[in-house]
Amino acid sequence: MQDTYRIALGADDAATAMKDAMAAYLIERGHRVTDLSAADGEDYPDVAERVARGVARGEHERAVLVCGTGIGMAIAANKVPGIRAAQIPDSYSAERARKSNDAQIACFGSRTMGIEAALVCLEHWLVSDFAGGGSAPKVEKIKQVESRNLTSPGVPAA
């Protein structure tokens, strides 16, 4: 585990308070935080895409997205090739998102959990690293699924 990361933060209008608490928490721990939250008129898919593209390009090592449930952000971020974003409902899922799935982006719901619980989950996610082992072939299969479906021309949308 690294001591500090370059972390992008993104939130929609429903999640400003949680995002601000997370930003303060991350900065206090020495992480370099870039806030890429919604500008006027932007919706969560716009934010998720901007943040996920930055992670995919290597501008950020990890990212945190927050909307009402975390679900929409995760869905949108996962449309960017190379990204594994996980909706985080609890600390065990936060840990497993990193250790088993190598998720670079954690997605939280401001309407589904309190700020303190979210910060506990955020810490579990931050201190966990991809374990490899038996999970490595599964993550490789996820990449193969992505390669076959997200980048194949002529594949009709579902």
Language model features: what each stretch is:
Residues 20-23, 75-79, 119:
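Short amphipathic alpha-helical segments
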Residues 2-15, 91-158:
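C-terminal binding/interaction regions
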Residues 8-29, 33:
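Glycine-rich phosphate/diphosphate-binding loop of Rossmann-like nucleotide-binding domains
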Residues 29, 81-83, 101:
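Short, structured coil segments at secondary-structure junctions
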Residues 32-42:
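A short beta-strand-loop structural module common to alpha/beta enzyme folds
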Residues 47, 51-88:
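Helix-adjacent hinge/juxtasegments
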Residues 10, 36, 66-67, 88, ...:
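Structural motif
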